Amino acid sequence: MNRSSAGETAKEPRPPRRRETAAARAERAATICRRLARAYPAADCSLDFGNPFELLVATILSAQCTDRRVNLVTVDLFRRWPTPAALAAARPRELEAVIRSTGFFRAKAKSLLGCARGLLERHDGEVPRSLEALVQLAGVGRKTANVVMGVAFGEATGVVVDTHVGRISRRLGLTRQTDAVRAERDLVKVVPRTHWIAFSHRLIEHGRSVCLARRPRCAGCVLADLCPRVGVP
């Protein structure tokens, strides 16, 4: 256990040994959030963007791609097509060439073009400040919509579940679901709403530095005493 949290040990819930009640899981989740907040106080979205439109585009590109790679690509992309109107008029092959290194470039180009046209046709070229409206745009699912709502607009509409968040949440026993949408349903029941936005950023940082996919570094983990799978890959 991390010694910095020793003062809370006597009061903090232990990881489940038998069937954990919903109330106990919520209490443990709240403790996890507090620990993560202390460990990663500056955790934030690692995508580079200057406005909601750029964040929307970057998040669509981030599927099955690292944020670092996306940030390299969007420098040129936003220079060429800085607005929804400009992107909607882009030539598909030219757009594909620019985003090729992000993977699945044909599908992503189609999504970006459809999304830009949707913004023009239904929202006067503005990114809607509504989860329901966002998910109606091409290439935008709950994950992307939650990122935009949380990061661009500061509104907690859900928990962003990426590979790191899903993996660590399952290890912590906060969900058993491998499907991102179903996992999110479990997480919003136990993670305090005030932590929904930051929770994902902090778990992503934790997943990159400590709770690795193949060899988690449990010995140095601030959540080890709260994790039912400590020491198990």
Residue spans for each PLM region:
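Short, contiguous pre-domain boundary segments
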Residues: 1-22
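Catalytic cores of DNA base-excision repair glycosylases
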Residues: 17-233
